[in-house]
């Protein structure tokens, strides 16, 4: 991830002077893997990286968190996935992703799951990898009764027959609008959108709303957590 912080995000055609510039180990999948490892989880990370400094350095970094990297493939003649991120003073962001090696992940790379997945495992995935791989993951997790958490970003269309098998979904307000056709302008709209996703069969809905915090809904619970 390459991040520039500024007072506001520029409009199309506008150039502004930004603030601090940062580079981080990132990617939604990598962030999820590291967070789970920090919380004490036994984590296996499956992805593809490029045959470059960023990819090799990333693998070394994951291993410092005791993440199992045996299923990380190195893709020849491809760059490691990169995200360019602009963040304003409220924490709102604008992101463009160049998938690189991430786009080369194949269903065959996940064939080990047929034997390795256990009932008490949890699978986290997002949409920075090919959509057919995501559909395979959802299907195999449902078949083996394994909970799957989906971060539906960057948005790609998933048919309801796949969404109904998702245990937990974590869209932001933009992705929620794509999924439900409801524009999230307040908590009441968040409730309507979350209910629509629950009606599709998803068990838990967590809508991230930037500076407005996080909204959670399940069949029998609901909460709004303010941003700090």
Q: At which residue positions do the language-model features occur?
A:
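Glycine-rich phosphate/adenosyl-contacting loop at the front of the ribokinase-like
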Residues: 1-48, 53-67, 226
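Beta-strand->loop->alpha-helix junctions that form or flank phosphate-binding loops
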Residues: 20-22, 46-51, 69-80, 151-153, ...
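Conserved phosphate-binding/catalytic loop of the ribokinase/pfkB sugar-kinase fold
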Residues: 48, 70-75, 85-122, 127
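Short beta-strand scaffold segments in enzyme catalytic cores
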Residues: 82-86, 94, 213-217
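Conserved beta-alpha-beta core of the PfkB/ribokinase-like small-molecule kinase fold
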Residues: 122-192, 212-214
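Conserved phosphate-binding/catalytic region of the ribokinase-like
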Residues: 157-160, 187-228
């Amino acid at each position: 991830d390459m991040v520039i912080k500024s007072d506001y995000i520029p409009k199309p055609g506008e150039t502004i002077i930004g603030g601090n510039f940062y580079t981080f180990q990132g990617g939604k999948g990598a962030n999820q893997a590291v967070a789970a490892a920090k919380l004490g989880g036994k984590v296996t990370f499956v992805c593809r990286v490029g045959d470059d400094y960023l990819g090799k350095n990333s693998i070394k970094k994951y291993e410092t968190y005791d993440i199992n990297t045996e299923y990380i493939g190195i893709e020849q003649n491809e760059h490691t996935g990169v995200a360019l991120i602009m963040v304003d003073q409220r924490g709102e962001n604008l992101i463009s992703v160049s998938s690189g090696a991430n786009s080369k992940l194949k269903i065959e790379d996940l064939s080990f799951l047929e034997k390795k997945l256990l009932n008490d495992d949890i699978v986290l995935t997002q949409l920075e990898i090919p959509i057919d791989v995501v559909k395979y993951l959802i299907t195999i997790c449902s078949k083996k009764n394994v909970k799957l958490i989906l971060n539906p970003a960057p948005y790609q269309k998933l048919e309801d027959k796949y969404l109904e098998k998702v245990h937990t979904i974590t869209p932001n307000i933009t992705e929620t609008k794509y999924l439900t056709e409801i524009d999230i302008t307040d908590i009441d709209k968040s409730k309507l959108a979350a209910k629509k996703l629950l009606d599709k069969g998803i068990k838990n809905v967590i809508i991230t709303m930037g500076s407005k915090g996080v909204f959670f809904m399940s069949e029998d619970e609901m909460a709004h957590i303010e941003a700090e």
